[in-house]
Amino acid sequence: MRRWKHLNPSLTLEGRAEAITEAAGREGIPSIFIAVSGDQLVGSAALVRNDMDTKLDLTPWLAAVYVKEGFRRQGVATDLIARCEIEAARSNASVWYLYTELASGLYEKLGWRHLERCGYKGVTVDVMRKQITS
């Protein structure tokens, strides 16, 4: 999870593992979903209550969307995001949010709309929102 370490430098590997364990294996928020190919972990996505400590009024959030190189552009991220959206709908959410540094184009193709561009933890991010379809 080095991809996002600069956003939470104080969170240790053990802390990340604990958060994932807490979110795994249950319904609702938080939830984490993984994609596997054979015995390889190839992607992940999470549904969390809050993902930006500066926007605590917005909830829930799509977070930790990642697909391993070699498995990208095959629909893995789209499938993981769709599964998170199903879980958000089951939790009675009507809108959900995300922030991204680099993948606005992907999310726009999936129906997400820009809410704002802002600085967050030293980087510029796009905050996006999407109506949840049940």
Regions found by a protein language model. Name each.
Residues 32-34, 40-50, 61, 66:
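Conserved beta-strand in the GNAT
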Residues 94-103, 116-134:
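C-terminal "cap" of GNAT-fold acetyltransferases
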Residues 108-118:
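Conserved acetyl-CoA-binding loop of GNAT-fold acetyltransferases
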Residues 5-34, 42:
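Active-site rim helix/loop that mediates acceptor-substrate recognition in acyltransferases
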Residues 36-38, 130-131:
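Active-site beta-strand termini and strand-to-loop segments that position acidic
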Residues 29-33, 58, 124-128:
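Short beta-strand micro-motifs in enzyme catalytic cores
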